[in-house]
Regions:
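Alpha-helical recognition helix of canonical C2H2 zinc-finger domains
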Residues: 39, 90
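A short, aromatic/hydrophobic, helix- or strand-capping loop or linear motif
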Residues: 53-55, 108-109
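Glycine-rich beta-strand-turn "strand-cap" elements at beta-sheet edges
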Residues: 98-110
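A structural feature that tracks compact, well-ordered secondary-structure segments
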Residues: 4-8, 14-22, 27-33, 42-49, ...
Length: 110
């Protein structure tokens, strides 16, 4: 099953997207955008940048968990992962984004 981007409006009225892997697990979430076109541009940026391993930035949280950000060429964060309990789990999450995002469908949620 292919991955998908879910584009939705949050309670604050901002547009956001989340990338779900083929198994339904959310693997990347965006920050809020003021417009639908901004959200669409964010999705396009994920597709463009996820194929470059240098665009992923892995971090260890104070609680000892691992997470990553996907960044655009200008250094701006495009999306953030969930927390992973292991370094290898985080690496697998990055690989899953790189594999899922380029061909993921976009679903509009209301």
């Amino acid at each position: 099953m292919a991955g998908k981007f879910e584009c939705y409006k949050d309670k604050a009225g901002e547009y956001r997207f989340r990338l779900k892997a083929g198994n339904g697990e959310t693997i990347l979430s965006s920050e809020g955008y003021s417009s639908k076109s901004g959200c669409d541009n964010g999705i396009a940026s994920v597709r463009k940048n996820c194929v470059n391993p240098d665009r992923f930035e892995k971090k260890k949280t104070e609680a000892g968990k691992f997470r990553f950000n996907l960044k655009a060429s200008n250094g701006q964060v495009i999306g953030t992962s969930q927390n992973y309990s292991s370094d290898s789990g985080c690496d697998n999450g990055m690989k899953s984004v790189a594999k899922s995002a380029p061909d993921a469908t976009v679903v509009e949620e209301s």
